[in-house]
Amino acid sequence: SGQNNRINTHENIGWYNYSGTFKLSDKFGLHTEYQWRRDNFITEWQQSLLRVGVNYQLNPRVLIRAGYALIETFPYGEIPINGLGRDFTEHRLFQMVQLSHKEGIVDFSHRFMLEQRFVGRYSSASVEKEDEFPLLNRMRYMVRLQVPLKGKEVKDKTPYIALYDEIFVGFGENVNANIFDQNRIGVLLGY
């Protein structure tokens, strides 16, 4: 019984993201983020994610963050993530540690995150709104490399390129078949 009942699909998802950090003092800050995720790149809803957190800069190379996210997921694609083809809400608590270092002109970061996900589900097809929110635990690890496209370091308004790989692993009682949840690989341009 080494087989897995996982279904793989390919979707054209557009992710549009706002991220802001507001420094409150030398050590504390506020992280804000909104992700507008669309199916068929932009034409249909896929997901809305609002995340806020409190940052604590332990030292120049170690950032700690704890926070909350509110996620609304809509049915999309050939096989909706929710078996009833309905939207659902997720309430998520998270804790994060990010370690940073520099080698030459390359900025490296390693992000370790724990998430406690309370994912809405319907106990039966007859209920109109999610009535159960079981706890799903997830660990995330991301490595990111960032290189300035001009100059020797990334400052405000410096163009840069970044590469990242993030692995998601579920654990605990309600995980079922999705222990290895996701692997996100990306290339970013920014300034």
Give short role names for the model-derived ranges:
Residues I81-M139:
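Hydrophobic, well-structured mid-protein blocks that either form specific transmembrane helices
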Residues N4-R6, W36-N40, P80-L84, S126-F133, ...:
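Extracellular loop and loop/strand-boundary signature of outer-membrane beta-barrel proteins
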